[in-house]
Amino acid sequence: MVKDSYCSFCGTRFSDDAPWPRRCLGCSNSTYRNPLPVAVVLLPMADGVVVVRRNIEPRKGTLTLPGGYIDLGETWQEGGRRELLEETGIEIDKNDLTLYDVRNGLDNTLVIMGLAKEMPLNALKPFTSKETQEVTLIDRPIELGFPLHTEVVKRYFAEKVTGKKGG
């Protein structure tokens, strides 16, 4: 069964080619398909950025920036702080995250990139979890598991070299 194939109000099946938002022929209510918010954190440390090796799909085994879905009731900063802690064991204050970028991501997501305050190298400890095989640093742009992460890291390091923001 295809996701969102039925009206969430009355259960009437939508035509597969019906555009979004979909107006139900059974009850006349409109159904919308909205993007899911994701928080991703750029955490500067020493001369690099913290990345994780994923232990779950998608992109299991690849390096990515820490992040994940924002839970209902969370601000993007709270979601970013929680995801960073869950995936790296590193705790930050939600107020130490500033908006870095917002992009459309894969699978109907809206990715909110937060830049954290730089942390000392001794904050990086060995860490694994259900979601994380490894936490490490990168000191230059590399290919990451998600193309969007690669683009943002490339921009971050370019701005670090030039001292200019907004590249």
Language-model regions: role of each:
Residues 1-40:
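Acidic, metal-coordinating catalytic segment for phosphate/diphosphate chemistry
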Residues 37-39, 59-61, 95:
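A generic structural signal for short beta-strands and their flanking turns/coil linkers
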Residues 66, 121-123, 167:
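A short Gly-Trp-Pro
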Residues 70-155, 159:
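Unchanged
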Residues 32-33, 59, 106-107:
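Short glycine/serine/proline-enriched coil/turn segments at secondary-structure junctions
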Residues 159-167:
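Generic C-terminal helix-cap and adjacent flexible tail
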Residues 43-44, 51, 115, 137:
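Conserved hydrophobic "DFG−1" position in protein kinase catalytic cores
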